[in-house]
A protein has these predicted regions:
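Basic, low-complexity intrinsically disordered segments
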Residues: 1-158
Length: 158
């Protein structure tokens, strides 16, 4: 039959190799570093969108329960303890933060302009904007500015 190569051997093609000592790593490997950093940045933004989306959904659920079933401080505190006992590595579910999730949802849920923007901005930035600004115009301006900063960080590879 012919010579066969084990799948675990000779994974790289047989070529005349460049002496690694003669390489300029900064020049040769920089494109690979760019690929890695861009992927990391995209992953971070995707995780952030999902996290903010989760906070939105939790806020919507809590808001509905407060209105329909008169959930109050005690029930929200019980939920906070319950979820942290089941997911001990998950942060961000203190009673105070759960109320912020409700406020976050109620602040933006009626706005077609603002609700898509909040997912492009980190949770801390959303809380600052929501807590310090009254008008929708000001919120929109700073949400857009914060979203551009996130994109700029991504372009820089940070």
């Amino acid at each position: 039959m012919g010579d066969t190569v084990s799948p675990n051997k000779n994974l790289s093609p047989v070529v005349r190799e460049v002496d690694p000592a003669r390489l300029d790593p900064d020049r040769e490997f920089a494109p690979l570093l760019d690929i890695i950093e861009q992927a990391r940045s995209r992953a971070f933004r995707a995780v952030n969108r999902e996290l903010v989306g989760m906070y939105w959904d939790v806020g919507a659920y809590i808001s509905a329960k407060v209105k329909a079933e008169r959930w109050g401080r005690g029930v929200v505190t019980e939920f906070s303890h319950w979820v942290t006992s089941r997911l001990p590595d998950l942060g961000g579910f203190s009673p105070q933060n759960v109320w912020r999730m409700r406020q976050f949802y109620e602040t933006y849920q009626g706005s077609e302009k603002l609700s898509p923007l909040v997912r492009e901005v980190g949770w801390s930035s959303n809380l600052l904007i929501m807590g310090r600004l009254k008008s929708d115009e000001a919120k929109e301006f700073y949400l857009r500015l914060a979203a551009l900063a996130v994109e700029g960080d991504a372009a820089d590879g940070d």
